Amino acid sequence: MWTHPISYDVIVVGAGHAGCEAAFCSAKMGASVLILTSNLDTIAKLSCNPAVGGIGKGHIVREIDALGGIMAEITDRSGIQFRILNQTKGPAVRAPRAQVDKQMYHIHMKRLLESTPGLHIMQGTVESLLDKENVIQGVTTKEGIAYLGKTVILSSGTFMRGLIHIGDRSFSGGRLGDPAATGLSAALKERGFPISRLKTGTPPRLLASSIDFSVTEEQPGDPGVGFVHRDEPFVPPLPQVSCYITHTTEKTKEIITANIRRSALYGGRIEGIGPRYCPSIEDKIVKFADKERHHIFIEPEGIYTQEVYVNGLSTSMPFDVQYEMIRSVRGLENAIITRPAYAIEYDYVHGNVIYPTLESKTIEGLFLCGQINGTTGYEEAAAQGLIAGINAVNKVLRKPDFIPSRQESYIGVMLDDLTTQVLDEPYRMFTGRAEHRLLLRQDNACLRLSHYGRDLGLLSKERYELFEHQKQIIEEEKLRLSKTFKKYGNSVVSLAKALCRPEVSYDTLREVFPEEVRDFGSILNASLEMEIKYAGYIERQKSLIHSLSKSENMTIPEDIDYQSISSLSLEAREKLAKFTPRTIGSASRISGIANADIQVLMVAVKKHAHK
């Protein structure tokens, strides 16, 4: 084993969405960084759907941008369709989503990482960890090289003992066409990490020229919608395309029902649990037997390829069944499959062995982020990469931990959930996971979090000043509109009061009063509308957070002995010792911890402070 002569502050293992974000932000904060990946040609590869964002997920991408991360920027550069979902619903659940060109996403990300000062990229497959007395020292690779580092970030995706299933055929792989990583799982198990299996899947890819789009429903994008917070209209750099909607038929249902036992999922060959909200088509047919048809979304994979992603037809059926199944769908009667669908099982680490900083409780200086923590989705992975990278650098520099709270961000909600809950399925972000989602809208992420990005050195002075200017605009416009009176309908009211009417939006008000109602761009317009229209609800939520903050943020001493607190229930003592929460708020969200236990714990914490 040859030891590389350069030692690094941060070593990142894996160059998926978590790894890229971790490596970039670490280098941006001034650390020397090495990112190791088994294939430089698959950096930031979109292994499943060619899309970024969506409900909950789009909120996270905007938060990453507000903190100084890169997913939003790369998405805007690579996007071939942009939309705002749930436009007719409440403001808390409206979310940006983009179809992206898979190749361009990879190219832009690789180019950005290669040009980032202090960041080195190397092809290599990590097989084991180097540690001494439970402190990380570095990693070793299959190629026979040892790399030394003060901190290590594992972002292995679905590669840890990945096992691909297509019907009755199963074979090792991190994704179709790429080898699995087998040594890393063994290295973690040897060091006492609790590991289990999860499962995910992907649909087949089809040749667009073989599809009859005339019988499908076209789904165009929305103009002027991007992910990066900016002060000018967004103009996508790439040509924009449409997606298309079709549906399964009665014949589809018959084919799946007749072959259900040939599915790897229903044939008993898969032990891992899949994501509840992204089920395979056979799962949908079985669990929703009374439903006549299921929607299928045809999504282009790029502007330089004919391949399309068939969203809604994820399956682990054998290829011959996939062939029949595809051709039973309206518009796909003559479709040509370019890549088969498959399911994949992989190892993940239980959340009770990581802190909310994403540092391991077992080995100091070792951080975990992405699917290795049991999450699913590019966006959840990227956010964890950002947090792991920030805290790895803070550890090297001996600076305080950075843990955004669940009251101020979806990233905080996710960190809290991952470290206080026992996962029984892959974790996916939804707006419903947040208690104060009206405060955590996608349009106000920069207003909530940009001060952290500035303090961490991730946001430039120019971008931070832009966000501060936007805050000022909102406050000034709220006041001005409240003092500007016009006849609207049958009465004279302030424009702020008019905007509070359910049927009135900022854009409709601007059309009626173009001189008085100014255009600040889609994101800022949305923020201004929500701040005025829902002012009462927003103030009530802020008041509630303030009243709960004292107990929520009460710190639990690291050396507290839960077993000695006899008034705690036995289950509470076991769960608290297992998860070792850092605050009373986190402790209260551990399954099995009753309100009475929290009251006892608060008394014990106060007594401990006076020792």
From Swiss-Prot:
Keyword Flavoprotein applies: yes
Listed name of the protein: tRNA uridine 5-carboxymethylaminomethyl modification enzyme MnmG
Entry cofactors: FAD
Membership in a protein family: Belongs to the MnmG family.
GO biological process, alphabetically ordered: tRNA methylation; tRNA wobble uridine modification
Role description: NAD-binding protein involved in the addition of a carboxymethylaminomethyl (cmnm) group at the wobble position (U34) of certain tRNAs, forming tRNA-cmnm(5)s(2)U34.
Main location, first listed in the record: cytoplasm
The gene coding this protein: mnmG
